[in-house]
Amino acid sequence: MNPGALAGMRVLEFGSRIGVGACGRLLADLGATVFIVEPRHTRQQRDDDATSVSGGSSKWIDRSLATAAKHSVLFDSAREADIDELAALAACCDVVLLSTDVDGADVRVQQALKHCPIFCDITAFGATGPMAGKPASEFDVQALTGVMDTTGFPDGAAMPIGLPVIEMSSGIYAAAATAIAWRVLRRDGVGQRIDVALFDTAINALTTFLPAHFAGKASRRLGNGHSMAVPWNAYESKTGWILICSANDAQWRKLAALISPGLVGNPDYATLEDRLARRAEVDGHVARWVAGLEVDPLVDLLLGAGIPCGAIVTIDQLHAEPNLALRQSIAEVNEPGTGRAVRVPTSLVHVDDDAVVVPAIPPLDSGRAAAHALAPRPRREPSAVGSIRVPFDGLRVIEIGQFTTAPLAARHLASFGADVIKIEPAEGDSARAWAPHRNNTSHFFIISNGEKRSLALDLRSDGGRAAFANLVAGADVLVENMKPGSLRRLGFDRDRLRALNPRLVYCAISGFGLKSAYDGRPAFDTVVQAMCGIMDATRLSGVPVKSGISAADIGGGQVGLLAIVAALERRKVTGQGAMIDIAMQDVGAWLTQLRWNVSDVSARDTAYKGPVASVADASQHAQTVARELLVVRRDAVGTDWEMLASPMRLSRTPPGVGPPLGAASTALIGWRTR
């Protein structure tokens, strides 16, 4: 984001967890100055530490990725001079990033860091609850929270997702929480502690599975399938795997016509209900057809017929994948000292067509001079506790979103005080119909949206567009996950939005981005998982497997949240809004980065302790209960709903969980008074 949205923020990155490294990098990409504290170890000692800390959950497994875009400062707790320099640096910074569960509790280090106003601690279980402070790896957490139980095939065992998705997801939440805390620090002079737990992040990722549990049904694994659509699966062609999604009867008829004319009129498969009852038969027809074809022409054939699909891209192919290459999502740089070529991600946040910046990898201790040149931060007198406003008091947000990405970003903004108006089509959001229901409303819809107000608008009508334009003129944020180009076709391109409101922060989240090699291509979470390396990272006997949780959808929404918070801070300086372009494929590829520069991944890397918990087990776990991760709220008509608490815990300005979203209003509603 140019100028850097978080320019002026100084960050001291001390913790060794992968999530800490991810958080620091995201903040650096948004303009913060990040000093990463590196151990004064030999390379072999560093590698040994990376595999011994919490089962490989250490960022030092790849120094290039851990340090890119940051300033390196070497440190040894046994050296008094290093302790003194750490204290001096902390006094000059706004934020310190920690992972106290795996890095110990050296009293001298704690004393050295105490002058930093914002403490962000990323741990396995957080600071409260019966498991507080206990170390655990990514895969221990996947097993304990039900995430692992959702991944794998129906007739097989649960599988770990072959990537540290919960660590990386926690890093995104931590970065967003840090940006929110910095907003409060600059406004009110109040620092605070941020508590981000992998456990909480994982429970929050179960949005598609928790409703079934609360309806008294057991969640089950579906491999690469879909509980409500057939065919929807991964199939092996002559030259690679492909993911094909048929979401309705019309798409099935198009697919059947390609496979065999006789299949189109087969009454056994005529309706979705018929195909769900004969899942194996339908999959067999598709698999036999795909097996005789090559993947690239098959993708073209299916897309030409309007059938969502995607080749399953391997991780070693990602840098050359056409859309990732166009968006310059992966850069190749030389490692200092060795000269070895390594791959690193560029920024996930594309704003106002800014040029992509290739991050540099710092030589060891190359940031020490810059650290010495800093002056300590002057500390303001903090506001009285009673006068501290919620972070987004008075913020006005429009959301046009279905399913996960935009609703997730807007839900979290609402939890910190924003006034969110969700725009639904005149007939209502299609997710309202998703089973299971309570009082004729989808629990998935409720749990995904949280506390918002809803307005039904027909944006194809003159009256609907006029009402929307009026809302935009008074809004601070517009976040949407419509098919790229949809708003433009409705008469609201970038120029029109700027004319209506030059201060508007507009965030578009889509599968492949506004700038894309795949203009107009439909994208489901599963298709994006196929095309970003996630499915390649998790295989059973060579068969690629999607993560049970909607990793690409969730990540896209999280990055949208972070980008919006950062753009709001930039607006304070420039007075101007921003046009943000988030691609779920970029985010999904970013989640795989720890596999980019390694040639071998051993079974040890996904090892875990203890039994695999079900979604039901996880929802009732003592840690879930103690941290109140699932809370009950009553809607306007008296129905009680289980809802998710935020995984971002700020000590002075905590997020809230308000009453759930009700029915969409057909009468025009306006903004609340600031």
Where are these regions (language model features)?
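Substrate-binding/catalytic subdomain of NAD(P)-dependent oxidoreductase enzymes
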Residues: 181-223, 298, 311-317, 567-606, ...
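Aromatic-enriched alpha-helical interface/lid elements that frame and gate functional surfaces
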Residues: 230-305, 309, 322, 385, ...
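Flexible, small-/acidic-enriched active-site or ligand-binding loops
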Residues: 2, 333-391, 638-674
